[in-house]
């Protein structure tokens, strides 16, 4: 939880 992953090209995934 609270983890943010950056995939590049402005794509973000936040795992709550």
Swiss-Prot record:
Keyword NADP: no
Organism per entry: Homo sapiens
Function: J region of the variable domain of T cell receptor (TR) beta chain that participates in the antigen recognition. Alpha-beta T cell receptors are antigen specific receptors which are essential to the immune response and are present on the cell surface of T lymphocytes. Recognize peptide-major histocompatibility (MH) (pMH) complexes that are displayed by antigen presenting cells (APC), a prerequisite for efficient T cell adaptive immunity against pathogens.
Full protein name: T cell receptor beta joining 1-3
UniProt keyword terms in alphabetical order: Adaptive immunity, Cell membrane, Immunity, Membrane, Receptor, T cell receptor
Superkingdom of origin organism: Eukaryota
Compartments where located: Cell membrane
Self-association state and partner proteins as the record states: Alpha-beta TR is a heterodimer composed of an alpha and beta chain; disulfide-linked. The alpha-beta TR is associated with the transmembrane signaling CD3 coreceptor proteins to form the TR-CD3 (TcR or TCR). The assembly of alpha-beta TR heterodimers with CD3 occurs in the endoplasmic reticulum where a single alpha-beta TR heterodimer associates with one CD3D-CD3E heterodimer, one CD3G-CD3E heterodimer and one CD247 homodimer forming a stable octameric structure. CD3D-CD3E and CD3G-CD3E heterodimers preferentially associate with TR alpha and TR beta chains, respectively.
A GO cellular component entry from the record: T cell receptor complex
One GO BP: adaptive immune response
